[in-house]
Regions:
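A short hydrophobic beta-strand->loop->alpha-helix junction that borders the nucleotide-binding pocket
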Residues: 65-70, 80-91
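Pre-Walker A adenine-sensing motif
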Residues: 15-28
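Post-Walker A helix-loop "phosphate-sensing" segment adjacent to the P-loop in P-loop NTPases
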Residues: 54-71, 76, 107
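Sensor-1/coupling segment of RecA-like P-loop NTPase cores
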Residues: 143, 154-178, 188
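Charged, amphipathic alpha-helical linker segments immediately N-terminal to NTP-binding catalytic cores
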Residues: 1-10
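Walker A/P-loop nucleotide-binding motif
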Residues: 31-52
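Residue-level preference for the first positions of well-ordered beta-strands
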Residues: 33-35, 82, 132-134
Length: 208
């Protein structure tokens, strides 16, 4: 798992985090849906946000007016190809619209960065997932069957990989939906830190 220390905000790449990155890369490579499950507090959400650089991306796409689009972007935005989304307590169709909107905003910032910084001509794709290769859905446990159907729809139509993050047991629940379950290629259990790693991290923090 990844550990974030509040004081220095330094993310420590643990073995679990590295395993999670490999899992994400495998899902992208084979365009599969993957399930990641683990107990609360082991670092699932933190790792997904670190992998997607989401705290940074979120600021980039949080523009209010059109003239703000891409103003603060740097070349990192062109590498942003993962959407991180926390499962909401809203209607399934609204959820789809929200995910579409995130993809659209990321595409818009990339386009404007290319125009403003690289002198490219303005052109905007109608496919909001054109430069997205992975969608991570956190807290999948909260979703009803209608939401899962919508996610399957996005997966089938948009040619992107997906990862569902949830509690242990989520893989058994998803097995009840054969149409969705048949598309799941990988499962990844997110473990707690080993005693050795905790010791190593504490030593590392102590030295700072």
């Amino acid at each position: 798992r990844g550990i974030s220390m509040n004081k220095s905000k330094k993310f420590i790449e643990t073995k679990e985090y590295k395993r999670f990155v490999e899992f994400c890369q495998a899902c992208i490579k084979y365009k599969y849906i993957g399930i990641c499950y683990g107990l609360p507090g082991v670092g699932k959400t933190l790792s997904a946000k670190q992998y997607s650089n989401w705290n940074w991306v979120e600021k980039q796409i949080d523009y209010k007016k059109s003239e703000e689009i891409g103003m603060n972007a740097d070349e990192k935005i062109l590498e942003a190809k993962t959407i991180f989304y926390t499962a909401p307590a809203i209607r399934a169709t609204k959820m789809t619209n929200e995910i579409d909107m995130i993809g659209g905003k990321m595409g818009m910032v990339k386009s404007m960065y290319r125009v403003l910084q690289l002198g490219a001509e303005e052109k905007y794709s109608t496919n909001v997932y054109e430069e997205i290769d992975l969608i991570i859905i956190d807290e999948i446990d909260r979703l009803k069957v209608q939401h899962l159907e919508q996610l399957r729809d996005i997966y089938d139509q948009k040619d992107v990989a997906m990862i569902f993050i949830g509690m242990p047991g989520i893989e058994k629940r998803l097995a009840r939906y054969p149409q969705l379950y048949s598309r799941i290629g990988f499962a990844h259990e997110f473990d707690r830190l080993s005693k050795d790693e905790i010791h190593h991290i504490l030593e590392y923090k102590w030295e700072e």
